[in-house]
């Protein structure tokens, strides 16, 4: 079990509880007790949901209105038909614009700033070559940003992927996913991973067709459905 309290300015902390499928129920309830001690109004992300765990949280009076699927696929996958290029510092403003247009509805990925991008670029895992961009007529149309994990196992993640709304309906989402997966395979990875909102039916269907399957379900629980995420 992994337990983390994420503190946020002017908002209740978010508690993250990560459990393996074979963790004992006692370990789970102990983790929930720790989460409740962080504050009764603290939202709880349960990373690794199953029916028994959900029933227990419901019995405590918690409700869930959001779930994420962690999906994985074996590599390699078919190659993308798109020509992509690596990210450069000069792309920051265009990336922020496309990201915020594509994710204006998203609780975490919306409202990104150049400063946020700079912070991500300063991390040990950042690799500009693994941040693939696709231009149409000189404008950034889509991007696929990958992230490599080494602990507890080597894993290549599609970290953020988006298509500018002006270019929807051209199949760019699928092709950019394939471009990112191809880069990860070229970097030596045999498994690709991503997170997607469970109710994003179009995205889930796209990933299903590529070969992704659901590896884990993460659910957000809270006592008051009006509390900000």
Q: Which residues are covered by each model-predicted region?
A:
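Short, high-confidence coil segments that cap the C-terminus of an alpha-helix
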Residues: 39-41, 129, 189
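A conserved beta-strand-loop-helix scaffold within acyl/acetyltransferase catalytic domains
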Residues: 4-10, 108-163
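A short beta-loop-alpha structural element at the N-terminal edge
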Residues: 83-97
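Conserved donor-binding loop and adjoining core beta-sheet/short helix segment
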Residues: 1-38, 141-155
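Conserved hydrophobic beta-strand within the GNAT/NAT acetyltransferase core sheet
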Residues: 44-46, 158, 192-196
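Conserved acetyl-CoA-binding loop-helix of GNAT-fold acetyltransferases
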Residues: 23-37, 160-165, 169-186, 204-209
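Conserved active-site alpha-helix within GNAT-family acetyltransferase domains
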Residues: 48-66, 174, 198-216, 224
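Acyl-donor-binding surface of acyltransferase catalytic domains
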Residues: 20-82, 221
């Amino acid at each position: 079990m992994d337990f983390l309290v994420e503190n946020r300015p002017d908002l209740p902390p978010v508690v993250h509880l990560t459990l393996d499928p074979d963790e004992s129920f006692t370990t789970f309830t102990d983790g929930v007790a720790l989460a409740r001690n962080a504050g009764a109004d603290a939202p709880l992300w349960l990373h690794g949901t199953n029916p028994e765990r959900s029933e227990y949280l419901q019995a405590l009076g918690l409700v869930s209105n959001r779930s994420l699927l962690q999906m994985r696929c074996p590599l390699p996958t078919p190659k993308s038909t798109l020509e992509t290029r690596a990210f450069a510092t000069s792309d920051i403003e265009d990336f922020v614009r496309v990201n915020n247009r594509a994710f204006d509805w998203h609780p975490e990925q919306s409202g990104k700033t150049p400063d946020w991008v700079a912070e991500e670029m300063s991390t040990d895992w950042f690799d500009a070559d693994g941040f693939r961009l696709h231009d149409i007529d000189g404008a950034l149309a889509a991007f696929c940003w990958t992230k490599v994990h080494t602990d507890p196992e080597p894993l290549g993640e599609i970290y953020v992927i988006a298509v500018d709304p002006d270019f929807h309906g051209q199949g760019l989402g699928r092709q950019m996913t394939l471009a990112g997966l191809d880069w990860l395979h070229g970097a030596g990875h045999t498994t690709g991973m991503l997170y997607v909102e469970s109710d994003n039916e179009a995205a889930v269907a796209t990933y299903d067709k590529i070969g992704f399957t659901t590896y884990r379900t993460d659910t957000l629980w809270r006592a008051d459905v009006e509390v900000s995420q």
